[in-house]
């Protein structure tokens, strides 16, 4: 295909990937928040689902999760993995797709990264540089 006919891919994927990812995210978040998965670990944790990334063929969904407070992440991931077939079936019922996407659960580390950057910005060396930049303008 000539270059002028190629569509530019956004960082999160195509528009369809983003839309389907958001639909799957809502379905998983609703399922977890309403106690639809009968697992003592999952029932004992409040889990947020900030993002779902879909593969280009929409057959794989990477579900990013974060337990409230960021504690017990390994235990929560194991519980989600153990209940993956049930969650996949429940999501398939809520989402109208040709194929039920396979779910892959990952911990969302954006919060940790944002905190690390915030701490870095508060270091004396960076504060000094920022102060010098504001004095020059």
UniProtKB/Swiss-Prot annotation:
InterPro entries (alphabetical): KH_dom-like_a/b, RbfA, RbfA_dom_sf, Ribosome-bd_factorA_CS
Coiled-coil ranges (or none): none
Entry's localization field: Cytoplasm
A Pfam entry, by short name: RBFA
Disulphide connectivity of cysteines: none
Transmembrane spans: none
GO cellular component, one term: cytosol
Gene Ontology biological-process entries: maturation of SSU-rRNA
Keyword vocabulary terms for this entry: Cytoplasm, Ribosome biogenesis
GO MF annotation: an example: ribosomal small subunit binding
Primary role: One of several proteins that assist in the late maturation steps of the functional core of the 30S ribosomal subunit. Associates with free 30S ribosomal subunits (but not with 30S subunits that are part of 70S ribosomes or polysomes). Required for efficient processing of 16S rRNA. May interact with the 5'-terminal helix region of 16S rRNA.
HAMAP family (alphabetical): RbfA
Family affiliation: Belongs to the RbfA family.
Subunit structure: Monomer. Binds 30S ribosomal subunits, but not 50S ribosomal subunits or 70S ribosomes.
Protein known as: Ribosome-binding factor A
The species this protein was found in: Rhodopseudomonas palustris (strain BisB18)
Record gene name: rbfA
């Amino acid at each position: 295909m000539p270059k002028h006919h190629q569509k530019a891919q956004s960082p999160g994927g195509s528009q369809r990937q983003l839309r389907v990812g958001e639909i799957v995210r809502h379905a998983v978040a609703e399922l977890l928040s309403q106690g639809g998965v009968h697992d003592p670990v999952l029932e004992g944790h409040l889990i947020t689902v900030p993002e779902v990334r879909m593969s280009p063929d929409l057959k794989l969904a990477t579900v990013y999760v974060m337990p409230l407070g960021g504690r017990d992440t390994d235990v929560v991931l194991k519980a989600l993995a153990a209940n993956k077939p049930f969650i996949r079936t429940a999501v398939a019922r809520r989402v109208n797709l040709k194929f039920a996407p396979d779910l892959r659960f990952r911990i969302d580390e954006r919060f940790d990264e944002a905190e690390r950057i915030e701490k870095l910005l508060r270091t004396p060396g960076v504060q000094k540089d920022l102060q010098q930049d504001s004095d020059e303008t």
